[in-house]
Amino acid sequence: MLRRNLDERDAQTKQLQDAVTNVEKHFGELCQIFAAYVRKTARLRDKADLLVNEINLYASTETPNLKQGLKDFADEFAKLQDYRQAEVERLEAKVVEPLKAYGTIVKMKRDDLKATLTARNREAKQLSQLERTRQRNPSDRHVISQAETELQRATIDATRTSRHLEETIDNFEKQKIKDIKNILSEFITIEMLFHGKALEVFTAAYQNIQNIDEDEDLEVFRNSLYLSDYPSRLDIVRANSKSPLQRSLSTKCTSGTGQISTCRTRKDQQVEDEDDEELDVTEDEN
């Protein structure tokens, strides 16, 4: 009868041990995968920050409407990364850390299992010793009575530890179910909050891009192609708008040293012509 009870308790202990091992395995895997998920999200935030910087740099080189639209888009996208940072921090605190805590919890349950197994092994050892004593010395009541007393103590201790283990594992199972529900609920809530904010931000960012006036920026670009010719064209317009006298004065005053020499040559030629005319008149009179 006692041997059968021992076998039943051993089977029960094995089942409890398997339950703890199962949680240790799968919670450990979940912890690693969720931690990798959080790291990937953090890296996505870092890449998005680089994208924001590049968009701002590009915007500074563009036409007014496109420049403003790109900057507004970058501002919205940067705001989204603030929400993503909050997402990372919440996932770390509400999902990864509780799963990580199960490493310590499982270790404590294994210690309880170890204590129970030790007590049951002691009980089984005392039972075997009693059976051997009865076989070897069936008439030695003192030795048999002493062995029975030791077995009784071992049985009481094993029963106590077994009951404690059952209660502990029962609470462990109850807490495990509650925790995994809370962890996954927190995960879903955090993701929904982020994606809800992301939808708002992306809607605003999309509108900023759609508000860019393509025609106006194209006109600005086309006008910029002729900016280098603007001074010469202005000079032509100004020249065409002057009177003949103004053009003559402008030509004489702005022609430089070579033009001054030409004016002086013409004046000298005029003086020489006048002298020749006076000489001709004098000769006729003579």
Swiss-Prot record:
Transit peptide start-stop: 1-47
Tissue distribution of the protein: Expressed in the heart, liver, spleen, lung, kidney, brain and muscle (at protein level). Strongly expressed throughout the developing limb bud, including the progress zone and the apical ectodermal ridge.
Coiled-coil intervals, chain numbering: 107-178
Cellular component, GO, one term: mitochondrial inner membrane
BAR-like as annotated region, ranges: 10-220
Entry annotated with the keyword Transit peptide: yes
UniProt note: phenotype after gene disruption: Knockout homozygous mice show uni- or bilateral abnormal bone growth or exostosis on the deltoid tuberosity of the humerus, abnormalities at the left stifle consistent with a tendon calcification, and abnormal digit morphology including polysyndactyly and osteomas on the hind paw metatarsals. Exhibit male fertility defects, caused by kinked sperm flagella with the annulus mispositioned in the principal piece of the sperm.
Region (Disordered): 258-286
Acidic residues biased stretches: 271-286
SUPFAM superfamilies: BAR/IMD domain-like
InterPro entries: AH/BAR_dom_sf, BAR_CBAR1/2, CBAR/FAM92
Keywords for this protein: Cell projection, Cilium, Cilium biogenesis/degradation, Coiled coil, Cytoplasm, Cytoskeleton, Differentiation, Flagellum, Membrane, Mitochondrion, Mitochondrion inner membrane, Nucleus, Spermatogenesis, Transit peptide
Membrane topology: Peripheral membrane protein
Role description: Plays a critical role in regulating mitochondrial ultrastructure and function by maintaining the integrity of mitochondrial morphology, particularly the organization of cristae. Preferentially binds to negatively charged phospholipids like cardiolipin and phosphatidylinositol 4,5-bisphosphate enhancing its interaction with mitochondrial membranes. Induces membrane curvature and tubulation, which are critical for maintaining mitochondrial ultrastructure and the organization of cristae. Plays a crucial role in ciliogenesis. May play a role in limb development through its role in ciliogenesis.
Protein family: Belongs to the CIBAR family.
Domain remark from Swiss-Prot or TrEMBL: The BAR-like domain displays limited similarity to other BAR domains.
Subunit structure: Homodimer (via BAR-like domain). Heterodimer with FAM92B (via BAR-like domains). Interacts (via BAR-like domain) with CBY1; this interaction is required for targeting FAM92A to centriole and cilium basal body. Interacts (via BAR-like domain) with CBY3; both proteins form a ninefold symmetric structure at the flagellar base; are recruited to the annulus in a mutually dependent manner and regulate annulus positionning.
Name of the molecule in the record: CBY1-interacting BAR domain-containing protein 1
Lineage: Eukaryota, Metazoa, Chordata, Craniata, Vertebrata
